[in-house]
């Protein structure tokens, strides 16, 4: 992801948000409106939720060579923690997982769950899964 590249000199927050927006848009088949008979791909929704988990973890832990956070996402004061950032992303992840489950149940399919170690996390494909 561009925002976590140490050589990137641009706006890291913009890069993260643009990446997340593009991924979520792809998970929803680039549609703004949905109708009762519209279909979504449960695997794209599931992968999108996992990618957001990975991005949140990277935002909370990636540091520069000098030891400073590349992106400050949480309150740094240990006496006054503010974890609203993680709560908001947790809510989005939960909604995506719930939608993936609903779509999978509707289609009578199961979601392919990949076992991953968070330390070696790679982003999962969302846009490249193709259209139905």
Which residues fall in each region the model found?
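Mature extracellular/secreted ectodomains of secretory-pathway proteins
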Residues: 1-118
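Short, low-complexity, Pro/Ser/Thr/Gly-rich segments in the mature regions of secreted, periplasmic
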Residues: 112-132
